[in-house]
Amino acid sequence: MKRLWLILFLFFSPTLGQNIVTQWNSKALQRLMHEWDVKREKMELHLQASMRRTGIDMWIIMSREFNLDPMLQMFGDYGISGWYGHRNAYIFFDPGNNLPLERTLLGTHQSGRMREFFPTIISYGQEGLKPHLADFIKDRNPKKIAINRSRTVSMADGITVEMLAFLEDAIGPVYSSRFISSQDLIFDYISHRTVAELEIETEASHRTWYILRRAFSNEVVTPGKT
């Protein structure tokens, strides 16, 4: 009954209702932007080191519209990467010699904050992705190219059969013979937490403990009745 009165009150008070919706939207946007900041910080702090520990100098993540690779969740996710573009290639390259990690997007339909994760963006038109991808790989001549293909780890198995065939055709047999699974890189990257990640995990564990403690306590459980 109280919920009904609340709904009716909000319905007949459009200004108040709009203010509440605005506050909810504002909080949701703040959480989303904080999530992006946490993911970007992790990438900047740990990805290049993880690639070096696992002996990988290039990592290619392929994606198509509405068929995103699971690992793109680590690099922005919805509103940043993965959901847009006819065909997109998200490429990380370690040039060595104490040079910073190259973070490049080859694709279309980039969102506003894309450059925070991928500062270099190469767009294509009717010529398609293939020539840009071929030139990019050839110019850098990577020794090991990680792709998201794995028999045992689902989050490291995001590339589709079609996208793998497209990638192999684009870069040719010389470079496609250098493909390795990204699973070791992904494990290493995920396992190295930032301070912000640890704070989130700690808060989540505290909330989980509170829910479990209350769920099995006499606050909600009555012996012989519940």
Where are these predicted regions, by residue range?
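A composition/biophysics-driven feature that prefers long, compositionally simple stretches
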Residues: 18-226
